[in-house]
């Protein structure tokens, strides 16, 4: 399978686990950043999950129902398909705001029947996902 051009790639970065987490999306046709969020205390998997949901919600809002979303996170793709963030991050005063965002994302998934394909970015074949923060 080849990379679809009419697509966005999402990725998250987190310094520590948990730690300052951020995520973004890049348009594969133009290379432009579609959105960026963070940093906020969290985990990489949460960032990957929120990045996909953010991309889906933006596509929905803009009527882009066929745009493909690529993520290199198998866990996040699975969580989105199950419409639930399965994080083990402890809910504390420091993570409360993040948990509110997670709950909003889960609610969005449960109330919207999105059609966008969500595909695994094949890093081994295609190199780093274009939305990568380049901090490894």
Q: What residue ranges belong to the model's regions?
A:
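Acidic helix/loop or adjacent segment enriched in Glu/Asp that either coordinates divalent metal
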Residues: 8, 33-71
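Short intrinsically disordered terminal tails
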Residues: 1, 135-136
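RNase H-like nuclease fold core
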Residues: 1-46
